[in-house]
Curated annotation (Swiss-Prot):
<feature type="compositionally biased region" description="Low complexity">
    <location>
        <begin position="96"/>
        <end position="113"/>
    </location>
</feature>
<dbReference type="Pfam" id="PF22991">
    <property type="entry name" value="Lock_Gag1-like"/>
</dbReference>
<protein>
    <recommendedName>
        <fullName>Uncharacterized protein YLR407W</fullName>
    </recommendedName>
</protein>
<dbReference type="InterPro" id="IPR053969">
    <property type="entry name" value="Lock_Gag1-like"/>
</dbReference>
<dbReference type="GO" id="GO:0005938">
    <property type="term" value="C:cell cortex"/>
</dbReference>
<keyword id="KW-0963">Cytoplasm</keyword>
<dbReference type="Pfam" id="PF13259">
    <property type="entry name" value="clamp_Gag1-like"/>
</dbReference>
<dbReference type="InterPro" id="IPR053274">
    <property type="entry name" value="Fluconazole_resistance"/>
</dbReference>
<dbReference type="InterPro" id="IPR025124">
    <property type="entry name" value="Gag1-like_clamp"/>
</dbReference>
<comment type="function">
    <text>Deletion results in antifungal drug fluconazole-resistant phenotype.</text>
</comment>
<feature type="region of interest" description="Disordered">
    <location>
        <begin position="90"/>
        <end position="115"/>
    </location>
</feature>
Amino acid sequence: MTVSTSKTPKKNIKYTLTHTLQKWKETLKKITHETLSSIDDSSGSDEKIEALFTVSQPAVVASKGIDRDSGASMSQVGGGVNSTLEMKLTDESEESSSANNTTTTASHTLSNSKKSTQNFENYNVVEERIKLAQKSKAPFCNAEKIWKRRRQLWTQPTEQSESANNDGVTRREIFQAIPQEYYARVYKKLVVDDKPLREPLNLEDALQVINAGWTETRKWANAAKGMP
């Protein structure tokens, strides 16, 4: 007795089609997700790149109407203007003299603090040599001590150096937030578009930008062939 198997191929075809459609659906979903993620990453990276550069501010133009109004008010006041101006000048001169006195006092305070705080700039080698020579009747032979003191003052950190180091770390963190594949865009804005930076790049970061730009513009490849 022969059993009909005509339904079996139909089931297999239906299963194959369903399985294929399911695969396509998953693949399309994955591609869509990756595309949207890349768009988000691109827009976020563009914002990070723009944050490196200064934004040009529009020029402020003085209004002529304001000038006319100010002139009219001056003419309406008449004789009272001179007295007002005299009072202003008097107040300003008093404030100026007070400011000068404050500046003078501050400069004296700074000079005194510099004298009390020894650093590489105010370290006087000649005075130090005289002081050391007076401590002994023997011929002076402590130049090495002066040299070590100068070296110690030269290598000790200052407020300015610490501030510069902190600024460098902050700039490095900002730059590292940009993906490496976007360095060529930074090069284009910096070199081609001639946009000024908000803050200077660290040397290592600047070299990475130049390398990416030269690779993109084939400067490295042309240089290897002896071409400009």
